């Protein structure tokens, strides 16, 4: 939300000092700077007329409570509309707004050229979003994106499950083998006697 609001309040020739209680807008003439494709300077040149206005927004655009931003869509809409009007009308004489439409303001196609080259803000495009990453985004009641203990247990679950599965299937295989051997020896008495002699009467100790 902070970055979105900052983008709404930032232009090439507008310096925003604060967006919480008020905004101080400074603008100065940039004679041909935007027209020539150059960047607007951060400090005015000598002899440049400076215009300073203090814009009061009343209550804060957003409030900070319990580690979360509270977004008011109505205030965002009003701010976007007001700021769009300010950034097109509050400027020093000769300020070019990033292009050269002021240099031919008396031309017949001035309004058309102005609308074509300006990036107008649509308040409907302002989204309500929380200042957290998309992948770990959580509701505002959660103080942290993810509990580290919960994350550790979540990672250990597959390992613990694999160990239990191996133990279970090993025991099952051993029991199945013992059952098969006993049934096979009972069905073959001669083989059962020979097996007994080998394992008990003549143990394989050598």
UniProtKB/Swiss-Prot annotation:
Comp. bias (Low complexity)? 82-96
* Cystines in this chain: none
Q: What topology does it adopt in the membrane?
A: Single-pass membrane protein
Predominant subcellular localization, coarse grouping: membrane
Q: Mind naming one GO cellular-component term on file for this protein?
A: membrane
Q: Where is this region: Disordered?
A: 81-132
Q: Where in the cell is it found?
A: Membrane
Q: Which residues cross the membrane?
A: 150-166
- Nucleus: is it a keyword of this entry? no
Sorted keywords for this record are: Membrane, Transmembrane, Transmembrane helix
Bias (Basic and acidic residues) ranges = 103-123
Its name, as the record gives it, is Uncharacterized transmembrane protein DDB_G0283731
Which organism encodes this protein?
Dictyostelium discoideum
């Amino acid at each position: 939300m902070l970055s979105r609001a900052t983008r709404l309040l930032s232009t090439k020739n507008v310096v925003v000092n604060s967006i919480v209680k008020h905004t101080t807008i400074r603008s100065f003439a940039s004679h041909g700077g935007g027209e020539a494709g150059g960047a607007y300077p951060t400090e005015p040149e000598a002899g440049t007329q400076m215009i300073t206005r203090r814009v009061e927004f009343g209550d804060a655009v957003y409030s900070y409570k319990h580690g979360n931003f509270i977004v008011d869509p109505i205030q965002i809409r009003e701010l976007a509309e007001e700021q769009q009007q300010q950034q097109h009308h509050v400027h020093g004489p000769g300020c070019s707004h990033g292009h050269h439409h002021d240099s031919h303001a008396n031309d017949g196609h001035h309004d058309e050229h102005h609308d074509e080259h300006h990036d107008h803000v649509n308040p409907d495009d302002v989204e309500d979003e929380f200042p957290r990453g998309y992948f770990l985004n959580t509701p505002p009641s959660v103080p942290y994106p993810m509990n580290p203990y919960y994350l550790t247990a979540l990672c250990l679950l597959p390992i613990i499950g694999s160990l239990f599965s191996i133990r279970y299937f090993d025991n099952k295989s051993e029991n199945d083998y013992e059952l098969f051997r006993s049934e096979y020896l009972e069905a073959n008495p001669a083989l059962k006697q020979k097996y007994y002699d080998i394992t008990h009467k003549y143990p394989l100790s050598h």
